[in-house]
Design a protein with these regions (language model features):
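C-terminal catalytic histidine-bearing segment of alpha/beta-hydrolase fold enzymes
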Residues: 98-137
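Gly/Ala-rich beta-loop-alpha elbow adjacent to hydrolase catalytic centers
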Residues: 26-35
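Alpha/beta-hydrolase active-site loop
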Residues: 1-18
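Short beta-strand/loop motif that positions the catalytic acidic residue
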Residues: 70, 75-78
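Acidic catalytic loop of the alpha/beta-hydrolase fold
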Residues: 57, 78-85
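Flexible "cap/lid" loop of the alpha/beta hydrolase fold
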Residues: 54-71
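A conserved short beta-strand
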Residues: 43-56
Length: 137
């Protein structure tokens, strides 16, 4: 976990050297969890989009405890089946920073598949994400 996080932080520094635009981390599954954790370590991260994050790094790292200190805008989504789990994962964060999207049309899908053209109801995910980005401006 820590080696991968170092790579993410190095990528953030690289982007900062090339652009003055805000950094928004975007990750799915374990990378969603990693993005949430990395956002704590780097002040240049403006926000995080985490698709189906979870406790993929236990026992070494407990993401729910780690992200409770995160005070940056976060968009978290999942399938309907995963929603109670990701909701619990984000429960320790200050709610003013959290946009937790639960799909209403169909069962939803996991990770990046929820945004795929192959998923019938992808538009509700895209709409929720665009509203999140609008609020960042």
């Amino acid at each position: 976990f820590h080696d991968i996080e170092k790579d993410v932080l190095a990528a953030i520094r690289y982007v900062q050297d090339k652009s003055d635009q805000p950094v928004i981390l975007f990750g799915s599954g374990a990378n969603g969890s990693l993005s949430l954790s990395a956002a704590l370590s780097d002040s240049s991260v403006r926000a995080v989009v985490a698709l189906s994050p979870g406790e993929y790094f236990m026992p070494a790292i407990k993401i729910q405890e780690t992200i409770s200190a995160l005070q940056k805008p976060v968009f978290i989504t999942s399938s309907k089946a995963e929603y109670p789990y990701v909701s619990e994962l984000a429960s320790g964060m200050e709610q003013k920073y959290v946009t937790l999207f639960e799909p209403k049309q169909g069962a939803g899908d996991r990770g990046t598949r929820s945004f795929s053209v192959d998923y019938e109801y992808n538009s509700e995910y895209w709409f929720a994400l665009m509203l999140f980005f609008k609020d960042l401006m």
